[in-house]
Curated annotation (Swiss-Prot):
Native source species: Hordeum vulgare
Biological process terms in GO annotation: biosynthetic process; methylation
Similarity section: Belongs to the class I-like SAM-binding methyltransferase superfamily.
CDD domains hit by this protein: AdoMet_MTases
Protein name: Methionine S-methyltransferase
Any one Gene Ontology molecular-function term assigned to this protein's record: methionine S-methyltransferase activity
UniProt main location, coarse: cytoplasm
Summary of the tissues where the protein is detected: Expressed in the shoot, scutellum, and aleurone cells but not in the root or endosperm.
Subcellular localization: Cytoplasm
Quaternary structure, from the entry: Homotetramer.
Classification lineage: Eukaryota, Viridiplantae, Streptophyta, Embryophyta, Tracheophyta
Assigned keywords, A-Z: Cytoplasm, Methyltransferase, S-adenosyl-L-methionine, Transferase
Gene: MMT1
Coiled coil: none
EC number(s) per entry: 2.1.1.12
Gene3D superfamilies attached to this UniProt entry: Aspartate Aminotransferase, domain 1, Type I PLP-dependent aspartate aminotransferase-like (Major domain), Vaccinia Virus protein VP39
Length: 1088
């Protein structure tokens, strides 16, 4: 039944008034189409309107557009289509206020057409910027997807799209048109108003395919744009603007690609792992920029189709000319459609001004995520408050093996930073998870049943070798010639076997060839106490060479440390390894340990972690304690990186699928082996070490020199950015000038061009090298009473000569000039250690006058002064304590003794609130001391990613960034509140707290507990300040440092920079301990 002529005239009359009126009339028709009762009648009306103008051809359609503000016409889909299984054209309504199909959308559809038919069949598809819906409808018509969601931010096109859907889903009589599966277009297509993919996100719709022909609009303000480019051109544009990730976000926006970039990132969150995205890309920015938009976000791309279209004559491209003027980047235009050589924007602009016509490429790209689940995690992290980092993101890789390694790590790092608001407490022997993964890898791939306790983690192979030699301090050691490069020069030049005068505990190292028969001959002749060696490649294939080494070292009484770094493959198909074959069948003898330095990764050739394997509990415990004393710990980030590699090799395996074969027990070593050095032994027996918590009940650590406060988002952003960036320049990892400014602003210390600035993974590692320098000069190290116990024990471990400067509780355990002078009178070659401005562990402060007086006394006696600022930067009660000006202090000091010099030791983690992420530095100006320091070359140094991170954070601090300054103030306020609460709790529970003005710890005397008896599980005896640590730990799970650690009789140390929940539990433990020992109750105050 045809529509009445009156209905057609009434509809046209309603449309004639204006565009808004035409839209209103169309909406009224849509309402009738949506109602089943009036649907057929409304469809017949539209059919009649179309026929009214169809006879007049295109001219009549244009006349309808001008007169009635709409038109209904046919869009030809495929004139070459054979047969009748699909339509060759669609009928579409258009109104002036929406995007009308033109070259862009037709080119896009042609690109979609290049896909095989199966690519969309039965899939869930979203079209972004659907306009009047013709592509969504055409896609549904041709490929029979399960559902197509046509999305557009403009509500008017959505209404017209629904009309077009009814136009094509029903015939002219208003009857449904069914496809081969018995469905109509109404079953397959829906249209919604949506800002890009917000509709799908809000409704939790997962998509198989995302397609989009999104407008690209050039920046309308070339002056502002050129200013931005000019400011950034100092970054050298890193080969070209299109290849520099840090500026890429700007480029994408200015070229009109910003909307596509956002669509791609939104698409990552809703597309299925096997999903596909297809986008139109105008080629004006150049193919490099267009393709990098996808590549740097982790996509593999395929250019489906490319053609040229004319540049609209009314488009102003002067903005592009301005960018070219201020950069080396060149845009791509063509002269007319037939030109095949690209011309730049400036040439194109001049040609257009002279009446010429220019064109540009238009391409259709299909893109699919590589490692989609991991890339999704990365973008989920960036979306959670780290959007600024996305401009630095670069997931483009020429080598798939690099991508396979780096993308999973970035996903892991994103999850770790997202889940851990503060860095977790990890043992110094290595992160428990990492040691579990190493043990798991050895068990799964090499059938060696190790436990995490058998694995001790070191910053590097060189550090592991030196620390092991210091633990045993052998008179003679034979070391593989390939492994001596980082050993102290003194070890390589002394010759103890001549029995000449040599210092006690001096190690003599003899270089040895790696070939086993020659090495064995040396061992038999020289009878060393320790042998450190690797293995030649041809000898590592079988176990024979290893068995011979074990035998000869056992016979002569040598300890063996065997390096297998070159032979351990992190692969799912590792090659044969004779040492690991041996360990699969036999327990490692007690006199032998295995060493492996991990440097074989695809991404960072200089990122190293090492681990040692021992099955002797005495040895692996001592190695763990040695790393705690001499290094502090190994970089957590480095362990995460290699841990991720191990995890990838283990994640797909079914655990314990094969029963573990019985191993032969290790041979009993009848010959006496060298034990630990006397200084190491006495230190290990008396020092306090990390107490690991059990799985059932975690230990609350108030005994550690680190903060567990929440890590600010700015820190996490900088960490993540350091890994997502590629092509980082040397200048971006150079922290020298930033540290110079920091020490100038904070301490008035001038570190000019003559000063040497040395970086270390930890401040403790740098300090220990200074101790060795002191020993080399035959000096005496002077510690004030009430010094960080780790530092004192580290010096004792290496048998340094030390002396204590007396201090008093009523002066906050600060060094008094008279006491310092009296102590210096007694020694020659003095080295004075001063912790300040904040004293660790007491939390009191040295003023500028205080340090000036101390330096004056040191200068009089020609002492070397080590000023340790590592606990400073978080002073929360500095009223009346003037800021340091070391430059002025030193200029006022007159010393006739050339030995006087000042060394500044620092740690950035407190200054920059990077709890758990350490970066030590050392500033020296005495050239002879610098030379001595460099004679101990095994220092573990921060990786370039850490240097990039800390340079960014130092920039925020030095430039007094308001947000970053507020974060530091917030942490200071938190620490002040914690200190106040802790003092109140301690004093209410029978302790005499000394109080503090800065830092993260304070001292307190257990006055009410001394002499009291306590009997709990694992502890029985009378309490004193030495056993208070064990008593508290056994009875409550709270771990503090005893007076043995502080060095101050009767005073224990409490660290209070804990995670808020742990701090609350610590307060409860202190109260509970009082009840256990003294009886009665104590009020527990909550924490802020």
């Amino acid at each position: 039944m045809a529509a009445a002529a009156g209905d057609v005239e009434a509809f046209l009359a309603a449309c004639q008034a204006s565009g808004d009126a035409a839209y209103g009339a169309a909406k009224a028709v849509l309402e009738r189409l949506e109602a089943p009762a009036t649907r057929a009648e409304a469809r017949r009306l539209l059919g009649a309107v179309r026929r009214r103008f169809a006879a007049g051809g295109p001219a009549a359609g244009l006349e309808c557009f001008r007169t009635f503000h709409f038109r209904i016409h046919d869009v030809v889909l495929d004139p070459h289509l054979q047969g009748f299984q699909q339509r060759k054209k669609l009928t579409m309504m258009e109104i002036p206020s929406i995007f009308i199909p033109e070259d862009w959308s037709f080119t896009f559809y042609e690109g979609l057409n290049r896909h095989p038919d199966s690519i969309f069949r039965d899939k869930t598809v979203a079209e972004l910027g659907c306009g009047n819906g013709w592509i969504s409808i055409a896609l549904a018509e041709k490929w029979c997807p399960s559902k197509v969601y046509g999305l557009d931010i403009n509500p008017r096109p959505i209404k017209i799209a629904w009309i077009n859907l009814y136009l094509n889903a029903l015939d002219d009589d208003g009857l449904p048109i069914y496809d081969a599966e018995g469905k109509t277009l109404l079953d397959r297509v829906e249209f919604y108003e949506s800002d890009l993919l917000s509709y799908c996100r809000d409704n939790k719709i997962e998509l198989d395919r995302i397609v989009g022909c999104i407008p690209q609009i050039l920046n309308p303000n070339p002056e502002a744009m050129s200013k931005i480019v000019t400011e950034n051109s100092s970054e050298e544009f890193l080969y070209s603007l299109s290849n520099y990730c840090a500026l890429q976000g700007f480029v994408e926006d200015q070229f009109g690609l910003g909307l596509i970039a956002r669509a791609v990132e939104e698409g990552i969150s809703v597309i299925k792992p096997s999903g596909l995205m297809v986008f139109n890309m105008g080629g004006r920015p150049g193919q490099g920029v267009c393709e990098r938009l996808f590549l740097r976000r982790g996509f593999r791309i395929n250019k489906l189709w490319q053609t040229k279209i004319m540049q609209a004559a009314d488009t102003d491209i002067s903005a592009l000319v301005e960018i070219e003027k201020n950069s080396r980047h060149r845009f791509e235009f063509f002269m007319d459609l037939v030109g095949d050589q690209p011309v730049c924007a400036r040439t194109a602009w001049a040609y257009m001004k002279s009446g010429g016509r220019i064109s540009h490429a238009l391409s259709v790209y299909s893109c699919q995520l590589r490692q989609p689940n991991q890339v999704k995690k990365i973008f989920e992290f960036l979306k959670d408050g780290f959007h600024e980092v996305s401009s630095s993101l670069d997931l483009s890789f020429d080598d798939d093996s690099v991508a396979d390694e780096k993308i999973p790590f970035l996903a892991y790092l994103a999850s770790f930073l997202q889940e851990n608001k503060s860095n977790p407490c990890e043992p110094p022997a290595g992160c428990l998870n990492f040691r579990n993964l190493v043990a798991g890898f050895m068990k799964s791939y090499h059938h060696i049943p190790l436990t995490p306790d058998n694995v001790v983690v070191f910053p590097s192979r060189a550090v592991a070798i030196e620390n092991a030699l210091r633990l045993f301090s052998p008179g003679l050691a034979i070391v593989d010639e390939h492994l001596t490069r980082h050993l102290p020069k003194q070890w390589l030049t002394s010759l103890a076997i001549e029995e000449s005068n040599h210092a006690k505990d001096t190690v003599t190292v003899i270089e040895a060839p790696r070939q086993s028969d020659l090495l064995i001959e040396l061992i038999r002749k020289l009878k060393p106490q320790v042998v450190v060696t690797g293995m030649a490649q041809f000898e590592a294939i079988t176990s024979a060479a290893f068995v011979n080494l074990l035998s000869v070292t056992k016979d002569v009484g040598s300890r063996l440390l065997l390096d297998i770094s070159e032979h351990l493959e992190l692969s799912s198909l590792p090659s044969s390894n004779g040492v690991l074959k041996y360990l699969a069948g036999k327990t490692l003898p007690s006199h032998a340990a295995i060493l492996c330095g991990l440097v074989k990764n695809q991404v960072y050739s200089d990122l190293e972690v090492a681990f040692a394997i021992s099955e002797d509990p005495t040895v692996y415990k001592a190695l763990s304690q040695t790393i705690e004393l001499l290094e502090g710990h190994t970089s957590v980030i480095s362990q995460h990186y290699y841990g991720c590699l191990f995890h990838e090799l283990l994640a797909f395996q079914i655990g314990d699928r094969h029963p573990q074969q019985e191993r032969e027990p290790a041979e009993v070593i009848s010959k006496e082996m060298i034990g630990f050095s006397s200084s190491a032994m006495s230190t290990l027996e008396g020092a306090e070490f990390f107490v690991p918590g059990s799985m059932e009940s975690g230990v609350i650590h108030m005994d550690l020199d680190r903060s567990f406060l929440p890590v600010p988002s700015a820190v996490n952003a900088s960490i993540f950015e350091s890994f997502v960036r590629q092509n980082i320049t040397d200048s971006e990892t150079d922290v020298r000038s930033s540290i110079q400014q920091l020490v100038k602003d904070s301490y008035g210390f001038s570190a000019g061009g003559a000063s040497e600035i040395i970086y270390g993974n930890t401040c403790l590692a740098l300090f220990n090298k200074l101790v060795l320098c002191c020993m080399q000069e035959q000096g005496t190290l002077l510690f004030p009473l009430g010094t960080n116990g780790h530092y004192v024990n580290a010096a004792k471990f290496v048998n340094a000569t030390t002396l204590t400067i007396p201090t008093k509780a009523d002066s906050g355990f600060k060094i008094e000039p008279s006491a310092l002078a009296d102590t210096l009178e007694k020694v020659s070659q003095p080295w004075v250690y001063i912790s300040g401005p904040t004293i660790n562990p007491t939390g009191f402060l040295y003023s500028d006058d205080d340090i000036a007086e101390l330096l004056s006394v040191c200068a009089t006696y020609g002492a070397r002064v080590v000023i340790d600022t590592s606990s400073s930067g978080l002073e929360f009660q500095a009223t009346g304590c003037s800021q340091w000006n070391l430059e002025r202090c030193l200029s006022n000091v007159k010393s006739s003794k050339p030995s006087f010099s000042v060394v500044l030791l620092g740690e950035l983690s407190f200054e920059l609130t990077t709890a758990g992420l350490d970066f030590g530095f050392l500033i020296m100006s005495d050239s002879s001391l610098v030379d001595t320091f460099y004679s101990f070359p095994s220092l573990s140094r921060p990786h370039s990613t850490l240097k990039y991170t800390f340079r960014k954070l130092l920039g925020l601090k030095n430039q007094k960034d308001q947000h970053f300054s507020d974060l530091i103030l917030e942490q200071k306020e938190t620490l002040k509140n914690r200190a106040d609460q802790l003092i109140k709790m301690l004093e209410s529970c029978g302790w005499d707290a000394v109080g503090c003005h800065g830092g993260i710890s304070m001292l307190a005397k257990p006055t009410a507990y001394i002499g009291k008896s306590l009997k709990v599980d694992g502890f029985e005896g009378k309490l004193d300040s030495h056993n208070m640590r064990e008593a508290l730990l056994r009875s409550t799970g709270l771990c503090i440092s005893s007076s043995g650690w502080t060095g101050v009789p009767d005073y224990c140390r409490f660290s209070f920079a804990l995670e808020s929940g742990d701090f609350d539990r610590a307060m409860e433990c202190i109260a509970r301990f009082r009840e256990l020992v003294l009886g009665g109750g104590a009020k527990v105050n909550g924490s802020n």
